C-alpha cells in the first residue's frame, strides 16, 4: 500500500543552495523486499534526490519540541551529509504532498576548514534543540554546530587509548571507525564502529563511568545535549556484536533512535534494518538484536549509509553514490514499533 506522501509519479521540489535555486526530484513507487525470517515487507514509497555527493548520514529534528514535525504543520525536518564535502543539507518535507524545501550550507568556513577538502563525515546527530554534531571517521573527531549552522560549538577528539583492544583495531583500520552516532545525557555519545570488528562504543568525559543505554540515558523531548568542557571524548566502554547480530549485520553503517525510544541499526552489506535490544547494561560485553526484529531493505537500494525513522515509524534511507542527479534518499513503508 502506497502512503499518502506519494500522490503522483514525479514531483519537482524547490530548494535553495546558498541563495541559488535548483530542484530535487521526488517520485513514488512500490518495490518490496522480503526474506524468510524478516518481519514483513519493506516497500519504497518515495524517492528524493539530495545534491550531496556520497551521502553518508541522516538526522531527524524532532522539534515542536517533541516530534519529528514542525509545529503547526505536517512537515518532517531532516539533515543530510556526505563524506566528500562540508555541505550540510537541511530538508523540510511535507508528509501529505511530498513537497520539499531544502537549503545546502557549506559549513567549512564556520569550522575553519578548507572547502575543497573531504570532510570524511560518516554520521550526524542532533538534540533537536540547539546542537547538531558531525562525526569524521578518519580524523576521529566530532564537530558540533548550532542548528542554524552559523556557529561552531566545539570540535572534540575521540580518544580510544584506554581500551587496548579498541585502540589496536582503531589505529589498524582508520576506514572502519565511526559510522553512526547518538547523543546522550551527561555529554555522552554512542558511536557505531563499522567492521573488523563491528562494535558499539560509548564516549564521554574522562573519568566518567559508562551508562549503557535505556530510556533514562537518552535525551528527553526538549532536552539539550550537555556539551562537555573537555575537547577530548574518551572511550568508556565497548560492546561487540553477539553471534546472532553478527549473522544479521555483516557490517554496521548507521544507528538511530526511533520515536519509540528504541535503537535501530542499518547494515549496508546485509541490506538489513535491525532493532537492537531495549536495554544495554554497562557491565555487559555484547549487544544483540531485539527478539529477532529485523527487516530486509527493498531490492535496488545499495550502499545504504544513512538512516532515520520518522514519527510514523517510516524508515528513511540515504545511499552513498557519487552521482548528484540520481535518487539517493528513499522513504520506506512503516515498521512495527518496539514495545
Feature locations, PLM:
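Bacterial N-terminal signal peptides that target proteins for export
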Residues: 1-13
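Bacterial N-terminal signal peptides
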Residues: 10-23
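Sequence/structural signature of beta-propeller domains
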Residues: 23-339
